[in-house]
């Protein structure tokens, strides 16, 4: 299995320590729980970044980092039909934050596979930096990543 993470070049060395998610929280974790967010494809990782463009997050200076996950590594998967109604809404976050934070604390697995809110039939992979099996993953060197400018422009009429 492969995972991909897009991040600012200046954070590449610490992209998988979960510190950003610990400090600010995320869809699948409460503030205080360290976790690294990745996607099963580079395309989904791109979309997951683009949904934050309106939040003022700059997209220049990004790098893509590929992660190889051994096939025999236990991965917990959560399917969309296992989630509470409304899980894709912004106000549906509390249940997801609790679910993810409990998984982090349980150390049940190093990887949690969760449906993307953007495309529920595709998956993001949460990596638990405190799990001993994280050492079994292969983290590749960051590669420069540039967003196609057409993704960021207004449609012309």
Each language-model region and where it sits:
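Active-site and NAD+-binding cores of ADP-ribose-processing enzymes
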Residues: 2-17, 58-157
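NAD-dependent ADP-ribosyltransferases
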Residues: 5, 13-29, 36-37
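Small-side-chain structural scaffolding
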Residues: 20, 36-39, 45, 100, ...
């Amino acid at each position: 299995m492969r995972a991909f993470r897009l991040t600012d070049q200046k954070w590449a060395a610490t992209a998988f320590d979960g510190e950003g998610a610990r400090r600010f929280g995320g869809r699948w974790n409460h503030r205080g729980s360290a976790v690294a967010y990745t996607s099963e494809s580079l395309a989904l990782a791109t979309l997951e970044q683009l949904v934050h463009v309106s939040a003022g997050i700059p997209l220049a200076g990004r790098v893509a980092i590929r992660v190889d996950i051994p096939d025999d590594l236990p991965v917990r998967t959560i399917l969309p039909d296992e989630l509470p109604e409304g899980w894709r809404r912004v106000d549906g976050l509390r249940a997801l934050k609790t679910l993810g934070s409990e998984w982090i604390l349980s150390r049940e697995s190093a990887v949690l596979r969760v449906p993307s809110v953007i495309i529920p039939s595709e998956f993001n992979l949460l990596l638990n930096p405190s799990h001993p099996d994280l050492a079994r993953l292969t983290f590749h060197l960051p590669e420069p990543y540039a967003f196609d400018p057409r993704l960021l422009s207004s449609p012309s009429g």
